[in-house]
Amino acid sequence: MRATWEEKREPASLARWDPTPLEIVRGMLELAKVDSQDIVYDLGCGDARILFMAVKEFDAQKAVGYEIRQDLCEDSRKEIQHQSLQKRISVIKGNFLDADICEASVITLYLFPTANEILRPKLEKETRFGTRVISHDYPIETWQIAETEVCSGGTLYLYITPQAFQSSSSNDTKNDE
């Protein structure tokens, strides 16, 4: 029996907190070529480790995370305050399906395949031209992968919008013209 939209929107069915190893975080940010011009969003940010590394090691202009769990939000916010990074890092308590992602230049994901499937239309509608989307371990079905990196902790998939969601047959047609 297929789950309804509302059942799929339940956070527990979309992801569980499984902290991404720091070497994978670094790999994700390197693959996305994050730099001082970037605004990085992490959907389901957990303890905000991607946000901290984006700002501290890659000098991202800003990093924003969405997290549904109150305890993780509180812990992350305390650490942001402790490190005096409130002007560059923010964690929003809420469902990432309701997130305003239009300012993101990089979006990181470590979500179940079902979550990627549910999130795909939102990404297609709301991301700006050239946004880099990085998914850890689970590809976004039907999207064209710009680059894949296999590392000891899993596989990273890089997509660049809007090219990622153009079908290969439409690309073939454009090349023939």
Question: PLM ranges: what are they?
Answer:
Residues M1-D38, E74-E103:
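S-adenosyl-L-methionine
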Residues R49-A60:
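Conserved SAM-binding loop of SAM-dependent methyltransferases across substrates and taxa
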